[in-house]
A protein has these predicted regions:
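NAD(P)+-binding Rossmann beta1-loop-alpha1 motif at the extreme N-terminus of oxidoreductases
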Residues: 1-45, 115-116, 176-180
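Rossmann-like NAD(P)(H) cofactor-binding subdomain of soluble oxidoreductases
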Residues: 11, 26, 33, 50-120
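Small-residue helix-packing motif on alpha-helices
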Residues: 25, 35, 65, 184-191, ...
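Short acidic-hydrophobic, aromatic-tinged amphipathic segments that line or gate anion-handling sites
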Residues: 44-48, 145
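Internal alpha-helical scaffold of NAD(P)-dependent oxidoreductase catalytic cores
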Residues: 92-101, 117-154, 165-205
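Short pre-catalytic strand/loop immediately N-terminal to key active-site residues, enriched for Gly-Thr
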Residues: 152-157, 212-213
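Single conserved hydrophobic/aromatic residue that forms the stacking wall/gate
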Residues: 219-229
């Protein structure tokens, strides 16, 4: 991992949780706080270039991406690079170097728990190497291959920010539940977690959102008899 911020930490945690050895994961990051968090996961910092590194995952902020990409090119011979950086198209990187294998990936932070969603776009990876990367991300949840570079940017909003939309909605539930449950945070957290688990299970078993909405409304709406009572 070239960059050890939040998304890198989430992916590394998920990989370790799902059986990958920490001996197979390395990181490069100058931030002392990130170094400390990753060291706590028993992942080693790579102090210098290593020809044994199979895949380099570019996981820095967009403003640092091109400089970091150049550093990778200078330190690794014909590297296989997977970019997690939002908003920078494959062509921008390939113009700098067209010999290295390159692809983009857009995971979300739920990868930390093995419940993530990752979109992949293959720019120039060999088929066998692309399968290897897809296999790695499949340890973290669902993998979707897209056929267009621009779709990765769309997935940034849908997948990357998707959990935030739900969390924002849940904040209003939390506020009401706190009043109903006499400010008991533990109970409220349990209710919200079970609510989301139930929603997930319902979608897995049925899948038709209209039917699920109707079922909920039928269950919660009073019948004519109830109204008379």
């Amino acid at each position: 991992f070239f960059g050890g911020g939040n998304i890198a930490q989430a992916l590394i945690s998920g990989l370790l949780l799902n059986g990958m050895s920490n001996k197979n994961i390395f990181f490069v990051d100058r931030n002392p706080l990130n170094q400390k968090k990753l060291n706590n996961l028993r992942v080693k910092s790579l102090k210098k270039s290593n020809s044994d590194i199979d895949i380099v995952i570019l996981s820095v902020k967009p403003k640092d991406a091109i400089q970091a990409y150049k550093e990778i090119l200078n330190n690794y011979k014909n590297p296989k690079i997977v970019s997690l950086v939002a908003g920078i198209k494959s062509s921008t990187y390939i113009k700098l170097d067209n010999k290295s294998e390159f692809m983009r990936a857009m995971p979300n932070t739920a990868s930390k728990y093995g419940q993530g969603i990752t979109a992949l776009y293959n720019s120039s990876f060999k088929k066998s190497n692309f399968k290897k990367v897809s296999s790695i991300f499949s340890k973290l949840g669902t993998v979707i291959e897209v056929d267009n570079d621009s779709k990765i940017d769309t997935f940034t909003g849908v997948i990357g920010s998707g959990p935030a939309y739900f969390f924002q909605t849940l904040k209003s539930f939390e506020k009401k539940l706190m009043r109903l449950c006499n400010q008991d945070e533990k109970i409220v957290r349990e209710i919200i977690a079970n609510l989301m688990k139930g929603v997930g299970s319902s979608i897995e078993k049925d899948g038709d959102l209209d039917n699920l909405i109707k079922a909920c409304l039928l269950y919660t709406s009073p019948s004519p008899r109830d109204k008379r009572l």
